[in-house]
Amino acid sequence: MGLLLLVLILTPSLAAYRHPDFPLLEKAQQLLQSTGSPYSTNCWLCTSSSTETPGTAYPASPREWTSIEAELHISYRWDPNLKGLMRPANSLLSTVKQDFPDIRQKPPIFGPIFTNINLMGIAPICVTAKRKNGTNVGTLPSTVCNVTFTVDSNQQTYQTYTHNQFRHQPRFPKPPNITFPQGTLLDKSSRFCQGRPSSCSTRNFWFRPADYNQCLQISNLSSTAEWVLLDQTRNSLFWENKTKGANQSQTPCVQVLAGMTIATSYLGISAVSEFFGTSLTPLFHFHISTCLKTQGAFYICGQLIHQCLPSNWTGTCTIGYVTPDIFIAPGNLSLPIPIYGNSQLPRVRRAIHFIPLLAGLGILAGTGTGIAGITKASLTYSQLSKEIANNIDTMAKALTTMQEQIDSLAAVVLQNRRGLDMLTAAQGGICLALDEKCCFWVNQSGKVQDNIRQLLNQASSLRERATQGWLNWEGTWKWFSWVLPLTGPLVSLLLLLLFGPCLLNLITQFVSSRLQAIKLQTNLSAGRRPRNIQESPF
């Protein structure tokens, strides 16, 4: 009965089950709570672990449509009817590969990188492509789009070269046509439609140079002071602030809208062969896909998130940013472990653990020969207390190292800040030069050091309580390790000395009585009258 009660006490409860992915966080939570750490009052930034809704998408602003940079990836296919022009065709292809730095060298990875993403807010611009036999990348509903540009689904672009034009870079004779809702665009003359392109745009862009007299203002996205302009000769967007000067921003090498429209078409290269008169000989087709070069930006197509759009894509997409589900844990939690409740985790059936049973049997066996089992259990608890104290020391050292790194980084940042303020002193400092809010770092390293000092004091207190007590259990156990092997023989000898004489006397009486009984039985069988053993023979 006592053994059964011990097993019931030591067997862990099977009702609750913690997810196996969080053992380290659970141990950290228990450690901080058991030591009364002041870090339990801090707020923790948490992210959701759910794979069904990994995050939220936010659309890019109209101005970001003009500044986010895209890049192209070109794949080519030789025409099966190519005749006699392999050498000049290879020459043209090598020229394209060498002279286009805005072309992506490594092949992109297609396919959604996130699924089940919800778009928050209204996208200022969406692009729709409807291609037969195209690759569907997802479709946003029209209700979440302010302005939707639709790429002409019937347009196919070709370019014809003569045999002496192979050294020239191929260009689209015109960009893929896009349509837009009536009344969305207004004719405006602005030098901003020429943009302020970086060095690669003017030399390697796929379209003809822009004409600032053919500039259209997107009225739905513009205000009195700020205009969003569309250049239809290059399918490029520009942002203009009427209250500022011309040096406002630079146009990327490949804009997002241009890349998205280029990826819906292909460039067919043909040549007039000098060997076959004036007949056109197809050489190869350029199939172009597009990716976002700006880090952190993605194509949002319905609930699918892409980093690259394949050639001949179809669907409705915008651009934006993706953030995981972020929330703040309550301040009274040391770590956000309770957020993962048991109701959200799968229950697992487990068999009864035999370790507590064996521990109980070991303690009972120890009590049968002495106090070895109780001594060992007490020593185990003492060692556990020491391990906790050592863990606290390790954590305090890690926090100290992290704080030293933060202090060092803060010193470097502040030094750079002073240098930037000196360089931009004529403009009022770096904050005024950037026209942004000034941000400052509040040094709270003193609080962190005080908390670390408290942790070290608590660790010392735990270690002292573990080493103190009756006979100092650690030293006592070393002495018991020598005595325990002799306990069995000593106990056996003691029992023999205590009960040996009594056992010997009982054995002697038993043997004597048996001998008398045998002698009496012998006399009766011989026919002699048995003599009374009590009377005297005389």
From Swiss-Prot:
The keyword Transmembrane helix applies. Residues 500-538 are cytoplasmic. This is Syncytin-2. Specific enzymatic cleavages in vivo yield the mature SU and TM proteins. The CXXC motif is highly conserved across a broad range of retroviral envelope proteins. It is thought to participate in the formation of a labile disulfide bond possibly with the CX6CC motif present in the transmembrane protein. Belongs to the gamma type-C retroviral envelope protein family. HERV class-I FRD env subfamily. Its main location: virion. Residues 16-478 are extracellular. A motif (CX6CC) lies at residues 431-439. The gene is ERVFRD-1. Ortholog of the human HERV-FRD_6p24.1 envelope protein. Disulfide bonds join 43-46, 43-439, 431-438. The keyword Transmembrane applies. This endogenous retroviral envelope protein has retained its original fusogenic properties and participates in trophoblast fusion and the formation of a syncytium during placenta morphogenesis. The interaction with MFSD2A is apparently important for this process. PANTHER family: SYNCYTIN-2 (PTHR10424:SF85), VIRAL ENVELOPE PROTEIN (PTHR10424). GO terms for cellular component: plasma membrane. One of its GO terms (biological process) is syncytium formation by plasma membrane fusion. A motif (CXXC) lies at residues 43-46. SUPFAM superfamilies: Virus ectodomain. The surface and transmembrane proteins form a heterodimer. They are attached by non-covalent interactions or by a labile interchain disulfide bond. The record marks 350-351 as: Cleavage. A motif (CKS-17) lies at residues 414-430. Residues 1-15 form the signal peptide. The CKS-17 immunosuppressive domain is present in many retroviral envelope proteins. As a synthetic peptide, it inhibits immune function in vitro and in vivo.
